[in-house]
């Protein structure tokens, strides 16, 4: 019987999150506990890259972390972002998040439909005159650079944040009694084994989001009970709802 589920992500900020509906429907408890956290660079670290934000006419956002840290650094460095700055986002949900910092205007905000940078590039190519700044995480690969170079776009990648471990303390390690653990990135899988080098799956169910995460879990010998996204279940919550429903029927 699955009752206690570890979700390796931050707790949802909205009270209307589907996770809470699932808890009520199936009598389960979700524990939200990220295995790593995102830390923004400070102004001094960013200045070391010798990049002037105001030299650019458009910003490309691949995540909410990128948005948060872009505007945090701008504020820290007392930079006023021009009204006519354009924003290109990999998907609409990220584009809408910009409203937290600036007024949302359709002529300034553009977004893709799949969440993949490769599918945003053709839209960016329609605005060849723009100079694109792309906030990234420390340790990023060169995929974005290659995609933008291929379209001959004027662009500059920059590091604005990094991922750091969010290790379990001794008390958390002793209290690790979950019936199911859900991972959202390969880093989460690595973090589990860093905190629990002798981890044995036994009867614990494992869920993963994304192909890379599933592969990382399987490479560690974990047996997966739940994988998302799928055409039928595009989100983890929709997949989780179906999974728990099936468990009840068995």
Q: What is each of the regions a protein language model found here?
A:
Residues 1-250:
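Conserved beta-alpha
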């Amino acid at each position: 019987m699955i009752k206690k589920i570890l979700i390796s992500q931050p707790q949802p900020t909205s009270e209307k999150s589907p996770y809470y509906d699932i808890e009520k429907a199936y009598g389960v408890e979700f524990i939200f506990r990220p295995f790593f956290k995102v830390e923004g660079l400070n102004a001094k670290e960013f200045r070391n890259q010798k990049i002037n934000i105001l030299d650019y006419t458009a910003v490309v956002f691949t995540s909410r972390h990128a948005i948060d840290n872009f505007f945090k650094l701008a504020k820290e460095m007392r930079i006023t972002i021009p009204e006519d700055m354009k924003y290109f986002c990999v998907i609409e949900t990220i584009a809408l998040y910009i409203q937290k910092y600036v007024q949302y205007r359709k002529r300034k905000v553009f977004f893709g439909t799949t969440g993949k940078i490769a599918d945003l590039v053709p839209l960016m190519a329609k605005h060849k005159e723009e100079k694109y700044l792309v906030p990234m995480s420390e340790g990023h690969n060169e995929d974005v650079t290659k995609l933008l170079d291929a379209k001959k776009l004027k662009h500059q990648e920059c590091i604005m944040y990094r991922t750091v471990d969010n290790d379990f303390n001794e008390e958390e390690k002793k209290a690790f009694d979950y019936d199911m653990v859900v991972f959202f990135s390969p880093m989460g899988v690595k973090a589990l084994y860093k905190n629990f080098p002798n981890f044995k799956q036994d009867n614990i169910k494992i869920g993963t989001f994304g192909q890379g995460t599933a592969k990382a879990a399987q490479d560690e010998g974990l047996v997966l009970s739940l994988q998302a996204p799928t055409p039928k279940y595009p989100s983890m919550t929709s997949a989780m709802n179906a999974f728990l429903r099936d468990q009840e029927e068995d």
